[in-house]
Amino acid sequence: MAIISEMEEARPSMVPFTASFDPSNPIAFLEKVLDVIGKESNFLKKDTAEKEIVAAVMAAKQRLREAEKKKLEKESVKSMEVEKPKKDSLKPTELEKPKEESLMATDPMEIEKPKEEKESGPIVPNKGNGLDFEKYSWGQNLQEVTINIPMPEGTKSRSVTCEIKKNRLKVGLKGQDLIVDGEFFNSVKPDDCFWNIEDQKMISVLLTKQDQMEWWKYCVKGEPEIDTQKVEPETSKLGDLDPETRASVEKMMFDQRQKQMGLPRSDEIEKKDMLKKFMAQNPGMDFSNAKFN
């Protein structure tokens, strides 16, 4: 487990850096940044350098997803505010005046009963394919799980206690009750898990799944379960996979949905199709007494 924030607290003297950024070729800019880091520090010589860079990239992606989520929420609020004046503009008589046709109707009017409380069962996941709670939120893709925990502004890494084991996570501030403390839905790879403090006000924990072909129904034991049928894998993630791996992932997702709906999975469908072809090719054979599993 690596702690990224520790390298941020002891900062050496500042080194000037200038470079032009071409949006069509961001990798070139990153290469220049890494060249400067390699020349001006020993960071790239560390054994954990690659892992820490990957964790920083994942943290940046998480911030981008959260920004997009907030943007969508603002747009939905604006659309609701636009609709409200339209309703308010209706005159009282227009709202209260019953239609003559309804008074002449002979059939009894069907009144929709008020909806009862939400049925217990899986919950629709958030935009990150996880859930939002009062003290933290989590999201996932097939390979990783990300947990974000808001902290008081100015929080330092030395004030945080974070213990990541194969099947359990403990996170909180030293001297206080743990914020997250429980067993994972499934095991993780501790050596490929990281935590970091973003802007001194957010603990971000990155977990690498042991089984990277399964969606987690919850992050920590005791949480409500999400409906894994409603998860939305990132298109870019699937596009980055090689054809064989992508086909396996899509097959797994299809089988998972079929299983939850009580429908046949892909291998069962394939067997039935093969049997139909065989029967069609051998019309003279009698299959009436045959038993099929």
From Swiss-Prot:
Give the UniProt subcellular location, in the record's own words: Cytoplasm; Cytoplasmic granule
- Position of the signal peptide: none
CC per GO annotation: cytoplasm
Q: Which CDD domains match?
A: p23_NUDC_like
Q: Which InterPro entries match?
A: CS_dom, HSP20-like_chaperone, NudC_fam
The residue ranges flagged as biased composition, category Basic and acidic residues, are: 67-102, 110-120
What GO biological process terms does the UniProt entry carry, in alphabetical order? response to stress
Q: Which UniProt keywords apply?
A: Acetylation, Chaperone, Coiled coil, Cytoplasm, Developmental protein
N-acetylalanine: residues bearing it: A2
Q: Which residues form the CS domain?
A: 131-220
Please report what switches on or represses expression of this protein: Up-regulated by heat shock.
Look up the coiled coil feature and give its residue ranges. 50-80
Intrachain S-S bonds: none
Which residues does the annotated region (Disordered) include?
Answer: 67-125
PANTHER family found in the cross-reference section? NUCLEAR MOVEMENT PROTEIN NUDC, PROTEIN BOBBER 2
The role this protein plays is: Small heat shock protein required for the establishment of auxin gradients and for patterning of the apical domain of the embryo. Involved in the specification of the cotyledon primordia. Also required for normal inflorescence and floral meristem function, normal developmental patterning and thermotolerance. Acts as a molecular chaperone.
Its protein name is Protein BOBBER 2
Gene source species: Arabidopsis thaliana
